[in-house]
Swiss-Prot record:
Native species: Pseudoalteromonas atlantica (strain T6c / ATCC BAA-1087)
Family statement drawn from the similarity comment of this UniProt entry: Belongs to the TACO1 family.
Origin superkingdom: Bacteria
Protein name: Probable transcriptional regulatory protein Patl_0550
Listed GO biological process terms: regulation of DNA-templated transcription
Gene Ontology molecular function, alphabetical: DNA binding
């Protein structure tokens, strides 16, 4: 499972690094989480997690503060979550998570990304059953048994603990995120995470090769350019010539 997660992260890093609208995407999500759950990160654990994630992605503090202040003021737009799924280039499985204030616009934009890359958008449940909604933590280490013991003593419902090339990866149900993180940091307050998030981990991989590689890149770029798209998850392993 760890390798699949790492492959997805590598594939997404190239598009994430090219995001010109990353600040607005974070601002929108922080605003909605604060509006729905409260503006105090100590009381709103989802907000705390999102702020930590934004800071890790180098989102400036003023962007975060502005979104929270906007939520505290009670004014502003109402965004609702929307999820679309289907098959991308090469038959890979794709989940697209959005925040929107206009469902018609969003589905039109997302469907356009699928149709212009010979991909197929499906209905709810088309591919999501082939992903596990997981809390994922990775950090330097080589003793997975000791980590598992710490988590079990904290009564964490662990899915899996892996160790590969000096990196330990912990998988747990997404509902166990804070419990897992607290157990790990209480055991080692100096612990620094390479990965620390709630994500969708694919159960299988789809290798994308040949002409499908360029189409896949176009598909990812088009989705990243959609204002309403927040996250894209896929199970593609892209094999590029010369790599």
């Amino acid at each position: 499972m760890g390798r699949k997660f790492e492959v997805r992260k590598v594939a997404m890093a190239k598009t994430a690094g090219a995001k010109t609208k990353v600040y607005s995407k974070y601002g929108k999500e922080i605003y909605m989480v604060a509006k729905n759950g409260g503006t105090d990160p100590q009381a709103n654990l989802s907000l705390r997690r999102l702020i930590d994630k934004a800071k890790k992605d180098q989102v400036p503090s003023h962007v975060i503060d502005k979104a929270i202040d906007k939520a505290a003021g009670g004014a502003g737009e109402d965004f609702t979550p929307a999820r679309y799924e289907g098959f991308g280039p090469g038959g890979c499985m794709v989940i697209v998570d959005c925040l929107t204030d206009n469902n018609n616009r969003t589905i039109t934009d997302v469907r356009n990304c699928f149709t212009k890359t010979n991909s197929k958008i499906g209905v709810t449940g088309t591919v999501s059953h082939m992903f596990d909604h997981q809390a994922v933590f990775s950090f330097p280490g080589d003793d997975e048994d000791a980590v598992l013991e710490v988590l079990m003593e904290a009564d964490v419902d662990v899915t899996e603990v892996e160790c590969e090339e000096g990196v330990i990866t912990v998988f747990a149900p997404h509902t166990e995120y804070f419990k897992t993180r607290t157990a790990l940091t209480d055991n080692n307050p100096e612990l620094e995470f390479d990965a620390d998030e709630i994500t969708f981990v694919p159960q299988t991989e789809t290798v994308v090769t040949g002409e499908d590689v360029a189409t896949f890149d176009k598909f990812m770029d088009m989705l990243e350019d959609c204002d309403d798209v927040q996250d894209v998850y896929h199970n593609a392993v892209v094999e590029r010539e010369g790599e």
